């Protein structure tokens, strides 16, 4: 997606290709839907081009970032940190690695919270409570070790 050049000029914006953007930016923040064309829009190649002082923020959709490549880039010091409100697979070892990385902040899909969203979540929360009350197994638990420890 690109705005009309007149609108970009009006907003004092300069369009640059993605590779140039990741090279120049101090902060890369993703705000696109997850489509075939946007899956892993940030991968090893883009991460390798980022400044070591730059941060990556993804509050849009898991799958936009190649989480394995992100973890490796962070471990190698290729970028300063990441803020993630979504990951590709909450139950993966890669996500655990990201969670254990000190320069990564992960939140549980709350970046887009609104009153309407809160109302829509009530049935899901009720189902989780019922599953727990019946001794069932929960899906998508990020910190399962605390659940198992009764904390």
Where do the language-model regions lie?
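Short acidic alpha-helix initiation/capping motifs at coil-to-helix transition points
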Residues: 1-3, 121
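Rossmann-like adenosine-cofactor binding region
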Residues: 3-97
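Rossmann-like dinucleotide-binding domain for NAD(H)/NADP(H)
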Residues: 53-151
């Amino acid at each position: 997606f690109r705005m009309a050049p007149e609108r970009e000029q009006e907003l004092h914006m300069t369009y640059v290709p993605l590779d140039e953007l990741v090279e120049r930016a101090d902060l890369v923040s993703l705000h696109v839907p997850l489509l075939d064309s946007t899956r892993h829009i940030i991968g090893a190649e883009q991460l390798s081009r980022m400044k070591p002082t730059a941060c990556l923020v993804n509050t849009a959709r898991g799958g936009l970032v190649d989480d394995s490549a992100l973890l490796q880039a962070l471990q190698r010091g290729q970028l300063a940190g990441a803020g993630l409100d979504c990951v590709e697979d909450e139950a993966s070892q890669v996500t655990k690695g990201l969670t254990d990385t000190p320069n990564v902040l992960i939140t549980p899909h709350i970046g887009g919270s609104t009153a309407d969203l809160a109302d829509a979540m009530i049935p899901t929360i009720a189902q989780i409570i019922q599953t727990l009350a019946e001794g069932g197994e929960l899906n998508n638990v990020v910190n399962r070790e605390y659940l198992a420890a009764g904390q």
